[in-house]
Amino acid sequence: MTTSLLLHPRWPESLMYVYEDSAAESGSGGGGGGGGAGGAGGGCSGASPGKAPSMDGLGGSCPASHCRDLLPHPVLARPPAPLGAPQGAVYTDIPAPEAARQCAPPPAPPTSSSATLGYGYPFGGSYYGCRLSHNVNLQQKPCAYHPGDKYPEPSGALPGDDLSSRAKEFAFYPSFASSYQAMPGYLDVSVVPGISGHPEPRHDALIPVEGYQHWALSNGWDSQVYCSKEQSQSAHLWKSPFPDVVPLQPEVSSYRRGRKKRVPYTKVQLKELEKEYAASKFITKEKRRRISATTNLSERQVTIWFQNRRVKEKKVVSKSKAPHLHST
């Protein structure tokens, strides 16, 4: 069936939408005169093409699945003025019953038409919308297709489930210890989205830090620094103030506390120290520097060795004198 809709050129710009509804609500409308229709009524694809292009009596006899309601703009609801010669027409082709659920955009009218109409087809989750204006020398604009997922129906339910799932993604806060497990060598950063931020979550909750080290001693605890006696001492606590003096082993870190393990001197070092002690029991500053350079020991080590050597000799002398005093 081909229906002709005629609009007066003095009417303002209007929009008309097509909504799918039951047959009982599609009977409103007014009949047109000999030249066209002044209102909008129900249309059905089962009507015979031999009827006159009038819109009277088209509602009520059509099934609910094939009927469409033409809801006019509020401007169109006022009584129309008498129409003169038709200024233009828009032809809407209604397809066969098997294709009633899918409507193609209407064909473009002749170039001589000056009165056009705006309408839309919400079929199958999609929306065909046309906005046409009533100008004398303006042709009809092509219809634009809007997918249903981009322009959802306003009657649909709000995406509450989607919002709740998004809220679960931002549940990583420092106070929630059960959300994740802390890893050594990483800092925990909360992922709280801002008001104007991107809605997608950022997966950067763990940021590596180069200078951070997690000290885990094999013979102690993480909360305490413990140094057992079985550990081998790998460095000395004394360092030579001269750049040319190289210590035997690298200096130990200051975080290890406790008594260091005794490191015996080598035979070459002991021989050099005994020779200098035989020459003089007390050393000067120049002599201490020279012994430190030759024995590869620090000046503090040389000084302490001479002190210990004098105490040892004093003990030996005192022990040797003790039996002699008791005998007398």
From Swiss-Prot:
Q: Give yes or no: UniProt keyword Transcription.
A: yes
* Any one of the GO CC terms: nucleus
GO MF annotations, alphabetized: chromatin binding; DNA-binding transcription activator activity, RNA polymerase II-specific; DNA-binding transcription factor binding; transcription cis-regulatory region binding
Q: Name one Pfam family in it.
A: HoxA13_N
GO BP terms: anatomical structure morphogenesis; anterior/posterior pattern specification; hair follicle development; nail development; positive regulation of transcription by RNA polymerase II; tongue morphogenesis
Q: Which residues bind DNA?
A: 258-317
Give its localization: Nucleus
Matching CDD domains: homeodomain
Q: Which PROSITE patterns does the entry link to?
A: HOMEOBOX_1, HOMEOBOX_2
UniProt xrefs under InterPro entries: AP_axis_regulatory_Homeobox (IPR051003), HD (IPR001356), Homeobox_CS (IPR017970), Homeodomain-like_sf (IPR009057), HoxA13_N (IPR022067)
Region labeled Disordered — which residues?
23-48
Q: In which tissues is it expressed?
A: Expressed in differentiating keratinocytes. In the hair follicle lower matrix, expressed in all 3 hair shaft-forming compartments, i.e. cuticle, cortex and medulla. Expression stops sharply at the boundary with the germinal matrix compartment.
- Entry superkingdom: Eukaryota
Enumerate composition-biased segments (Gly residues): 27-45
Record has Mitochondrion as a keyword: no
Keywords of this entry: Developmental protein, DNA-binding, Homeobox, Nucleus, Transcription, Transcription regulation
Q: Which family does it belong to?
A: Belongs to the Abd-B homeobox family.
Role description: Transcription factor which plays a role in hair follicle differentiation. Regulates FOXQ1 expression and that of other hair-specific genes.
Q: What is this protein called?
A: Homeobox protein Hox-C13
Q: Which organism is it from?
A: Mus musculus (Mouse)
Q: What is the lineage of its organism?
A: Eukaryota, Metazoa, Chordata, Craniata, Vertebrata
Q: Which gene encodes it?
A: Hoxc13
